[in-house]
Amino acid sequence: MALIDCSGGEFMEKLASSAATPGGGGAAALAGALAAALGGMVCALTAGKKKYAAVESDIRRLAEQAESLRRELLKCVDADAAAFAPLAAAYAIPKDAPGRAETMERCLRGAAAVPLHIAECCAAVIEMQRELLDKGSALAVSDAASGAALARGALCAAAANVRVNTRLMRDRDCAAALDVRAAALLAEFCPLADRIFEDYYKENTNG
């Protein structure tokens, strides 16, 4: 049974168990998908409203983007588990076995690649929420801010799961390239998510 086909409660039970998967990468992907879904909600509450007719085409474009990101991140929940499976098997290979180091290296690269993709998707979600905060229905801007905050956490979680694999790689050039990409996403999009949330909070103070 695919992880994404589990109920929310079943997924949480698996996540809280001693099972190897789902883990941090899968949780990051699911959180990112939830953030994208919040963007979809903003679009659904804005589309077709006379008050927002001037941005209708933008909202329809953003709705398609939100749906695409949501679907991609949901796929990543199981993709992360699938990438970890061969790594778990590689750990079981005797340390003096021929070819173990090469197998480990290949599996570590694969296990790092998925959370990096998750991080990239979460960055796109954050960028989308910036536009939705500006153009979405006033009744739903809290959902854009919530989506940005949730995607920020998912981005950080995904980056952590890149690092847990790259730190063990022998090919330090490859590891550094992956780490640099993850760090660049954190440096650009965490502050953007913070600004989105702060802008929402400042514009919606009491009095």
Region spans (language model):
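Amphipathic alpha-helix face/heptad-repeat signature
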Residues: 30-34, 62, 69-76, 111-121, ...
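Transmembrane signal-anchor/signal-peptide helices with a preference for the extracytoplasmic
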Residues: 41-53
